[in-house]
């Protein structure tokens, strides 16, 4: 991914790792995932640029994607003007009084930071949020038209009905908590630990993504990720992941300081939610105590981000031996996975610890816990009092956001999560031109060529390892704009008068679609982002990249902008995603996507040493006296930023090698490229959200991502940066991995 989790940092990532953009911001969670929602995620046919008890139904058939209709020829018109400034860069957003060599972020973006107010409904604001606002408006038009079309049929009717049901506030108020009552009654009827285990299995959903989107969070007891097998990427494996917390991370339960106050607010939130739902005799204090016990056995974010530690294959029979406590037969039966022979258990100690708690903690405590999470997850689809209470904690207390998003924005997000590709098909027809795709495809080809040249020039790497690296690069497949085939939603029931039911059925539909992959060959044309999603993705287990249509907008990409700015922004994003195939996680996968060591021991030691130096560099960034960037946590994204920007610079020079260097408004091509990079990472954040991101986001804050330039030799003469300035690094201290 390019983006992060809070609206503070949206990052580029890999392997179903959302690299650029963000997972849902806490206060803007997709109602569809019925909580601070998993990633709010989604470029044309993936073109090669080189050479259990499962539901009876198989994965829904996909429909081949059609290219957007060609635009009609029109009379010649004046060349379009860039959206920003005279050549694609917002020079009014600079602070020219700040020396570039002391604080490049302030130099490039200080004026923007000073004049920009964070919208009241956001925890932070940046380039991703800016583009996402436009994408939301464009999507709203599509949904409004579909909802108003009473003669609509097929997918158009489904998206219109889903959106209309969410927008029907009067209908939702009239029903009260009744749509959720069957689930609450089922929880109340649980009579023993076997029934509890089956009920916990029934809550399992495909709501995490370990490698592509680096989305590890679920409030369900465990998360499930269906993806190619680490050791045999021709087939799928189910990955079981720790979960069970209502707050974002273990530190919120175990640390002191502001976390202690947040725990008090969380307990009060739990009590209010249960009272609103009329759940009798529930005990908020013991729910918090149970979640605290779960947090104590959780693996840390850094441990969870370690692929090699996560590659633990368990046979179904191993669960009872290695993780006693939970009735695993009942759990897997409830999850529809009883016939599955093997699993990959990502955090085995946490899974064992959570399982033991099922046996240890009283049944009534678990029933209270399940009831609370059922209501809290559904709050966006229940009367206003529920949604307001959910936002009061997750939006305001946790992230510092004063105002909830307008209902139409929440409806757009919910609709995208439920029917994202059906909406994306219409979005592409309206908002993604063949000209934009062609120019982006050319940029990709230039970036791949430049990255190959950087591999050839890597003096620290042996010929043997270079050969394998070049093979991996040659096998990289890239999708631009939209998927080559569309998902089939015909089996999903959507009713215009059932907002909560629509969300629950969509979530279950997606879960069943995922577990139906087991035993099937891997579909290497499936997309994990929607075209209207502002992000990008590297999929390490398939050696594949995808770039949705929506990210190809200013300030990342502008067809009317100067090429240097486009390469500094979108070119670096593309380079970032390519580089994820060779970062500290991507480097563990070979050209087929298999977890395999293709390095010589000496080369890998040198690679790790360079990574350690970069982690140490980012450890020095301290946005608060008591909080710093965790360089180990952000290392994969930081490697991709350094390599992506360096590759974008080389690709621009390659594309313009036969053209004279032109100065525009006093800026040289090199200056424009680096300013384009910094502009892409302009950002502001509320303190609570900023602090949360430092704990949980694998992307460094945008302010520090922009300072990646200090590792690029060409930046120094471009801005006359001298020894003694704050961002100056001696040549030997500049990290060059690729």
Label the model's feature ranges:
Residues 80-83, 98-171:
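Active-site-surrounding "flap" and adjacent substrate/cofactor-binding loops of secreted or lumenal enzymes
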Residues 13, 19-31:
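Short, Lys/Arg-enriched N-terminal segments with co-localized hydrophobic residues
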Residues 59-79:
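Post-signal peptide N-terminal segment of mature Sec-exported envelope proteins
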Residues 77-92:
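Short, Gly/Pro- and small/polar-rich lid/capping loops
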Residues 78-81, 322-325, 337, 344, ...:
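Intrinsically disordered, low-complexity linker/terminal regions across diverse proteins
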Residues 12, 16, 33-53:
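Gram-negative bacterial Sec-dependent N-terminal signal peptides
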Residues 51-61:
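Bacterial lipoprotein signal-peptidase II cleavage site
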Residues 146-446:
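Noncatalytic, helix-rich "gating/capping" subdomain that lines the substrate-entry/channel surface
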């Amino acid at each position: 991914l390019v983006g992060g989790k809070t609206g503070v940092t949206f990052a580029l990532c890999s392997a179903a790792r959302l690299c650029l953009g963000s997972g849902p911001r806490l206060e803007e969670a997709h109602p569809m995932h019925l909580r601070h929602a998993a990633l709010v995620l989604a470029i044309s046919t993936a073109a090669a640029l080189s050479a259990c008890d499962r539901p009876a139904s198989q994965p829904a058939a996909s429909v081949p994607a059609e290219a957007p209709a060609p635009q009609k020829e029109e009379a010649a018109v004046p060349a379009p003007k860039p959206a920003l400034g005279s050549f694609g860069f917002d020079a009014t957003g600079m602070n020219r009084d700040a020396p570039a060599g002391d604080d490049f972020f302030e130099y490039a973006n200080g004026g923007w930071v000073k004049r920009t107010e964070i919208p009241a409904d956001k925890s932070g604001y940046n380039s991703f949020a800016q583009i996402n606002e436009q994408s939301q408006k464009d999507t709203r038009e599509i949904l409004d038209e579909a909802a108003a079309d009473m003669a609509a049929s097929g997918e158009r009717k489904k998206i219109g009905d889903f959106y209309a049901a969410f927008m029907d506030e009067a209908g939702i108020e009239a029903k009260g908590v009744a749509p959720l009552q069957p689930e609450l009654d089922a929880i109340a009827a649980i009579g023993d630990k076997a029934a509890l285990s089956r009920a916990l299995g029934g809550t399992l959903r495909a709501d995490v993504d370990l490698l592509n989107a680096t989305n590890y969070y679920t409030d369900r007891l465990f998360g499930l990720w269906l993806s190619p097998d680490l050791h045999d990427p021709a087939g799928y494996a189910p990955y079981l992941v720790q979960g069970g917390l209502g707050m974002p991370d273990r530190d919120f339960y175990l640390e002191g300081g502001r976390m202690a106050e947040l725990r008090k607010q969380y307990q009060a939130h739990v009590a209010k939610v249960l009272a609103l739902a009329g759940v009798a005799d529930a005990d908020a204090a013991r729910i918090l105590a149970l979640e605290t016990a779960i947090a104590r056995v959780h693996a840390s974010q850094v441990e969870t981000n370690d692929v090699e530690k996560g590659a633990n294959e368990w046979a179904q029979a191993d669960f009872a031996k290695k993780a006693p406590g939970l009735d695993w037969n009942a759990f897997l039966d409830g999850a529809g996975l009883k016939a599955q022979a093997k699993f990959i258990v990502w955090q085995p100690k946490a899974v064992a610890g959570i399982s033991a708690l099922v046996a240890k903690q009283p049944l009534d405590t678990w029933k209270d816990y399940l009831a609370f999470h059922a209501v809290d997850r559904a709050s966006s689809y229940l009367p206003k009092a529920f949604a307001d209470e959910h936002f009061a904690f997750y939006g305001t207390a946790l992230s510092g956001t004063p105002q909830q998003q307008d209902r139409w924005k929440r409806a757009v997000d919910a609709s995208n999560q439920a029917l994202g590709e059906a909406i994306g098909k219409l979005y592409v027809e309206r908002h993604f031109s063949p000209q934009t795709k062609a120019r982006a495809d050319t940029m990709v080809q230039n970036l791949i060529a430049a990255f190959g040249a950087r591999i050839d020039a890597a003096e620290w790497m042996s010929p043997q390892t270079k050969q394998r690296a070049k093979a991996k690069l040659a096998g990289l497949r890239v999708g631009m704009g939209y998927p080559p085939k569309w998902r089939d939603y015909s089996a999903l029931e959507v009713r215009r008068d059932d907002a909560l039911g629509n969300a629950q059925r969509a979530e279950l539909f997606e879960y069943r679609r995922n577990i139906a992959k087991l035993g099937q060959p891997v579909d290497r044309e499936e997309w994990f982002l929607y075209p209207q999603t502002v992000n990008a993705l590297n999929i390490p287990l398939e050696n594949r990249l995808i770039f949705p249509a929506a990210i190809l907008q200013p300030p990342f990409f502008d067809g009317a902008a100067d090429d240097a700015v486009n390469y500094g922004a979108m070119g670096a994003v593309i380079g970032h995603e390519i580089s994820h195939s060779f970062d500290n996680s991507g480097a563990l996968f070979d050209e087929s996507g298999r977890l395999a060591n293709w390095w010589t021991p000496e080369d890998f030691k040198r690679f790790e040493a360079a990574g350690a130096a970069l982690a140490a560099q980012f450890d020095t960034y301290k946005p608060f006296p008591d909080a710093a960037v965790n360089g180990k946590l952000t290392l994969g994204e930081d490697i991709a930023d350094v390599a992506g920007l360096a590759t974008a610079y080389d690709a621009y020079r390659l594309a313009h090698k036969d053209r004279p260097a032109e100065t525009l408004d006093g800026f040289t091509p090199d200056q424009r490229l680096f300013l384009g990079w910094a502009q892409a990472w302009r950002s502001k954040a509320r303190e609570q959200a900023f602090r949360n991101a430092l704990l949980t986001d694998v992307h460094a804050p945008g302010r520090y991502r922009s300072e990646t330039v200090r590792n690029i030799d060409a930046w120094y003469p471009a801005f006359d940066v001298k020894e003694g300035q704050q961002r100056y690094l001696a040549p030997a201290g500049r990290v060059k991995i690729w």
